[in-house]
């Protein structure tokens, strides 16, 4: 993830989840990088800029990580992750 995208993601996260100002951007950036490795590895090749499901999953992963509840994220979002993986398995032309 590029720095511009990381900065935008941190800003979105702070606004959407009402993260207090005393929680530093660098800490949120660390959660984003951690989430990129965790969530991104579940569906390699997806782009955070164009894939809105990936973006949503990453922000929610960051929120759960912020509250130290990563295992609950995996339990709660497993069906969304599976659907996301299945949707991106087939390309636009309908071929595998």
Per-region residue spans from a language model:
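Conserved short "hinge" loops at termini or chain/domain junctions
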Residues: 1-56, 67-69, 87-96
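Active/ligand-binding-proximal structured segments within catalytic/core domains
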Residues: 59
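C-terminal structural segments of small proteins and small subunits
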Residues: 64-86
């Amino acid at each position: 993830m590029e720095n511009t995208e990381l900065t935008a993601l941190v800003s979105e996260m702070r606004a959407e989840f009402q993260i207090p100002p005393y929680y530093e951007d660098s800490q949120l950036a660390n959660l984003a990088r951690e989430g990129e490795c965790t969530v991104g590895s579940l569906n390699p090749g997806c782009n955070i800029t164009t894939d809105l499901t990936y973006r949503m999953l990453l922000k929610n992963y960051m929120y759960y990580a912020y509250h130290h509840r990563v295992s609950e994220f995996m339990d709660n979002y497993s069906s969304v992750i599976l659907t996301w993986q299945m949707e991106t398995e087939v390309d636009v032309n309908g071929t595998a």
